[in-house]
Amino acid sequence: FKCIILIMDINSDNNSGKKFNFDSFSNLDFYRNVNSQLLDLADIDKSKKIVDLGCGNGGITEMILSKVSDVSKVVIYAVDSSSTMISLALKRFGDRKDVFINYIQSEAQNLHENLKEKVDTVVYCNSIHYVPEKESVLRQIGDGLSEGGVLAFNTSFFDGAHPKETELFLRKWMMKSLRVLRNEYNIKPVKSKVQSRIQLTPENYEDIVVKSGFSVKKKTIKNIKVPLDGWYEISSFKDWIEGVLPGVPLDIGKKVLQDTVTNLFKELNISTLDRKWLSIVASKS
């Protein structure tokens, strides 16, 4: 087992970060399947040096290792801005003696400063929607790729991600949540537009990819049946709470969103609610 840990100019997470992180959601089977499909789309088994950008608890890294034919010939750079997530990833692979993983704590926009080696593939799962300067970050990613290197990313935050038949459910969910906030907590969200809610169309994403020096090789938009667990667990995630209920204290937002979505699933007698995922695989031009 070989491991290099690089901690880069990011403050350690506090306890609230641990309480409201992405960990519980990222372990759900449906979500793992979404990311597994992206790795297959990217032909990940052909790469030897791979960046898992926004690695979280190491779930994607683990999936990458399961898809390559010889892990001893693969180097993975597991990158995340959160020290909590880096710690979870470290723990996940603590017993693996056969893999070479470099852990780098860094924001996506600072990766070029913290990783100087050229790589074959950058995998960027469900995070690109948080980045304000997408073109700048993608250009930096391209600069870090070998000639013909691959960028693979996905997101469920884009214009058109909600199928029309789900709009009534989502409106009801928000109405119920706002009612509970008003009646039980005397709180209402503040008007705010966080980055993940400034949504681009799939065509916008393609244009940005091309302008950043890539050629789009594959693009898919898939309808995913998200179970109640998915909506329940995403409602414990800080960025989701701040996105749908900006200004509401996280602990209150979490409880309200989880209670109302659970009740609404029961009320409507449904087991899943659809959401679309956009996946793009591009090569360095």
Q: What are these model-derived regions, one by one?
A:
Residues 16-17, 217-271:
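C-terminal helical/coil "lid" or tail adjacent to the Rossmann-like core of SAM-dependent
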Residues 21-37:
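Conserved SAM-binding loop and adjacent beta-strand
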Residues 113-122:
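A short acidic, Gly/Pro-enriched loop at the edge of an enzyme's catalytic core
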Residues 121-134, 157:
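A short SAM/SAH-binding and catalytic strip from SAM-dependent methyltransferases
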Residues 135-147:
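A short glycine-rich, Lys/Arg-flanked "PGG" loop and its adjoining helix->strand segment in the class I
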Residues 197-212:
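Short alpha-helix
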